[in-house]
Each structure stands twice: as structure tokens, then as C-alpha cells.
């Protein structure tokens, strides 16, 4: 008798997510902007309304990914700070402590796959818009989509790299240095 297959952590099944509502909203915003761009003019005859709705969905996707989904699904967050005195701008990356928080393999897989696939789809649509030469307005909308999606992709990639580097560094050096310092200080205090 065949046994039903059990879903394994890491599969692309939203039911395995540690945060299913966050994941569904994340995927919903990611796909809705693309779908509105592709099929909006078929259902809504007003070009300006389709343009504005697509732009609003892109903005919602950017905000939700940057401020909510990244933090809840993979424990990463980023923002840009500007020094008001000098006008210099720099990115700040934050990651959750791997010792206190476990990231669901399913959430992680959905997050990174969607993060890299979405800009690739928008690049394909940009090439299509250039080849068709139908309207510069459509190309401008794709350019806005590319700026927003690539910004999040680059920022989260850097944030993940920063997170991995600090985790490896703390594992390699943290335990030994802290133990040596604490042992040396306590040894001196109680001699």
C-alpha cells in the first residue's frame, strides 16, 4: 500500500511556512504588480488607471518586502541613513541572531527565489518593451519596477552576506576571545 507523501520543510508549499500570512502577502504583492502590468489593459480600459495601480502595487511590494517580509521570513532588514551634517549616505544592515531565531527553510526558499526571479521577469518585460517600441510610458513603468525590485535584491543580498560574515566571525573568534578575556580578568581579580 502506498503511503501519502509528507511535505518536507524547504519545499515550495506555503502551508509549511512559519509565517503563512506574511508569505502570502509577500507573494501576492510580488505577483500582483506583474499581473496588473501584463493584463491590466485587458480588464481596465483606462491606461492611466492601470499605470497608477501598477505603480501603487510596486510601491506596496517594495515597502512590504523591505519592512515586513524580510524581517519575518528570513530575519533580515536594511535601511539607508543620511548624515545630516555631511550629507553622506550609507546602508545599514541588520540580521536576527541565529542563536535565538530559527528561519524556516520553506520561508527562506520562497523569499530568495522570489527575490531573484522578480527582477529577472521585469528585465524580460523591459527587453520586450524596447523591442516593441509601442510606448515610452510602458518602458518608464518597467524602469521604475526595475529600480524598486533591484534595490531590494541588492540590499537583501548584501544584508545576507553581512549576516553570514558576522555569524562566521563570531563563531570563529567570539567564543575564544570572550573566554580568554573573561578568564584573564576573573583570574586577576581573584589572585
Swiss-Prot record:
Its main location: Golgi. Keywords: Golgi apparatus, Membrane, Transmembrane, Transmembrane helix. The chain crosses the membrane at residues 16-36, 38-58, 110-130, 136-156. Coiled coil: none annotated. GO terms for biological process: protein secretion; vesicle-mediated transport. It is found in: Golgi apparatus membrane. It holds the Pfam family DUF846. One of its GO terms (cellular component) is Golgi membrane. InterPro entries: TVP23-like. It is a multi-pass membrane protein. Golgi membrane protein involved in vesicular trafficking. PANTHER family: GOLGI APPARATUS MEMBRANE PROTEIN TVP23. Belongs to the TVP23 family. This is Golgi apparatus membrane protein tvp23.
Amino acid at each position: 500500500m502506498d503511503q501519502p507523501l509528507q511535505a518536507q520543510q524547504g519545499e515550495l508549499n506555503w502551508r509549511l511556512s512559519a509565517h503563512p500570512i506574511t508569505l502570502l502577502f509577500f507573494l501576492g504583492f510580488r505577483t500582483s504588480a506583474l499581473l496588473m502590468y501584463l493584463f491590466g489593459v485587458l480588464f481596465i480600459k483606462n491606461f492611466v488607471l492601470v499605470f497608477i495601480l501598477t505603480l501603487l502595487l510596486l510601491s506596496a511590494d517594495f515597502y512590504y518586502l523591505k519592512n515586513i517580509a524580510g524581517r519575518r521570513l528570513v530575519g533580515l532588514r536594511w535601511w539607508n541613513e543620511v548624515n545630516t551634517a555631511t550629507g553622506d549616505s550609507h546602508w545599514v544592515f541588520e540580521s536576527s541572531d541565529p542563536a535565538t531565531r530559527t528561519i524556516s527553510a520553506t520561508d527562506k526558499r520562497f523569499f530568495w527565489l522570489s527575490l531573484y526571479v522578480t527582477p529577472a521577469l521585469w528585465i524580460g518585460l523591459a527587453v520586450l518593451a524596447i523591442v516593441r517600441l509601442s510606448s515610452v510610458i510602458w518602458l518608464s513603468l518597467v524602469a521604475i519596477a526595475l529600480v524598486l525590485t533591484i534595490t531590494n535584491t541588492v540590499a537583501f543580498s548584501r544584508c545576507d552576506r553581512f549576516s553570514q560574515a558576522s555569524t562566521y566571525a563570531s563563531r570563529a573568534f567570539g567564543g575564544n576571545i570572550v573566554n580568554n578575556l573573561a578568564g584573564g580578568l576573573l583570574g586577576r581579580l581573584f589572585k
